[in-house]
């Protein structure tokens, strides 16, 4: 009995340091506050307005509009309004053999002063050769030009194309025209036109 009491006292004596060790207060943690991070983002860019309307009040496209909606407009019948910027004229032949001239074609743009060829739209297919145009213009000036019967399916030869004219064209917007011309951004295979502003008439 005495020996058991001694063993209990020894066990309690050994446990005292352990209890004191567990009861010691923990070391205080130092929490350091990080500085506030201010985001350095670029300003939201202001997008400029489109240079020209997609379509006009009469439903015709601008050249800008045709090409900005290329997926929807390519290989479709369209109407497009623009100014005639340049008309192809075959070069004069001074020495034989003469090179075969290109088929008649012209370029239109959204403004009269547009000088970037990439912003011009080629119009093709309104005549087979320059002789057809010259003859039709001569007859028209004499009041004797008669357009072909619509039942024939032949298109009238345009006689009022002048650089500076504002014209609404109708035709097939395509990458490859019937006259052998091609353009990856599209060209117009002519079907018809109406002249909105005629500079030749204004000069008279």
Residue ranges and their predicted role:
Residues 22-204:
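OB-fold and OB-like single-stranded nucleic-acid-recognition modules
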